[in-house]
């Protein structure tokens, strides 16, 4: 057995053991990387290299967008914007079976698109629509399952922090192209959940809402326009070359703050608390990005990506089977690992394999984000699943049975995105971004 392989086994073993015993993901990544580096190079050199990699990994202009988008999401979550989006969603989906559940899906797509956070969408929509569903006699497990199943769509529909992280790791991948590539897969996911929610609503006897008068509908849309304009301003500005994704994220913060103050949903004195919440989340993400840069360097030094690539290509050279294997791997990884560290660790491993048979890095990025987003609604570390159940006032054990059919239809959507590249690439190509 070669020294590189021995070091690779040490790294993987330490990482797995630390994760199993419940160590924080950042600590597990850092410890396993540090030990493996000391095994390869002198301790003083490994410490110096680690410091350099941490700085280099987090010293990226595009990553500055992450704290701003997180802050914008927190401001909107506290600023009355969610209520207006829910009212708009109720008008859009009011005539469908299980109208309140359908409006939950639409609202998650709208709020997630603005905030970029699936967990924030699940909390905001569950807290707003959940009580209305309970009042109308909806089963808690049904309403929670719909909320949980649709919340991750916000990680695919731009602006998306996960896509920004992927872009920084993959290198030379346009954030604007990734943003556009996420629209159709995100809408496909949301549409699939709506279809199944409607079928289940009919079986349960949940009726459509009464027809809303045109005047009321127009008033509701008018009230939601300022909130929806945020998407138009940010995405339109990025696509039009007016500003970068990073600059757009700062504009999103200013716009969301001004809008929330106009709505009088919070006061100036609330801003420090909201900023502190965003700073905590940003600190965790940046910490993991820096430590994951050490792991990426150590893996490249030991040749782990080549080993995995050779192992997969040794099983088959059929690209369709390879994509299926990658999907299975990412679904398993997403079940046990949060989205950001999974992107940081597995992008350097899997992207070269996909490039070897001609897969576009943008298509792979969407595939990666789609797979790992599914992990956010699966135990044991599904953040959106935990958030949705807590807000919905139910338990994971009771929701899982109702959630299983949604897993099935989301997996069908995943296969469509996997094997029909144009679902991801169409908008980016039409707009000349690739």
Question: Language-model segments: what does each one mean?
Answer:
Residues 1-434:
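Alpha-helical transmembrane segments of multi-pass membrane transport proteins
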